[in-house]
Amino acid sequence: MKPDTPYAGIANLPNTLTFARLVCIPGVLISLSFSGRWPGFLAALLFGLASITDILDGYFARRQGSVTVLGKFLDPLADKLLVSMTMIMLIPLSRIPVWVVIVIITREMAITGLRAVAVSEGIIIQASPLGKYKTILQAVAMLGLCLHYTYFRVNFHVVGMTFLWGALVLTLWSGWDYFRQFNQVFSLPKEKK
């Protein structure tokens, strides 16, 4: 296959890591369909492995210069699916408030929609540093809420909820920041007319 074909480089290391993250998602969901320490521990382990692939795929994509269109699409999709589906599965276990899940998922859908509209107009809205911090807090929160129980005198449910409240604040703050950027960018042409 020629290097300049649309499919060139699809089977690179970063994309393979992203696919591995997608493969972890059903394991997390199946584990969380059961209550108890061991299913929660397994869910946390798989979620943690998936989160590590998220760090590594970005690192290798930049280092190897192997950023692909597929990777740009799949990486954020895998992130959103992992976190959103994990949060949804934690609801029946009474480990996370429903309204928090609704707020976070609604924000993700709204921002994804805004970015799609911007891209269709040839405009790139830069990722906010707040969004990166939000993602980190969400990941730690999900790990804590999956573990849920007390280990080594640490109540992981409390740890998870503490990080979740921080993630919620950054979710709303970064969401407002995206809407502000979107409004500024799309109001410029109107002012020039």
Regions found by a protein language model. Name each.
Residues 1-14, 19, 24-25, 35, ...:
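C-terminal membrane-associated helical module and adjoining short loops/tails
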Residues 67, 121-123:
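Interfacial helix-loop-helix junctions of multi-pass membrane proteins
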Residues 55, 59, 112-120, 178-186:
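Membrane-spanning helices that line or support transport/gating and their immediate boundary helices
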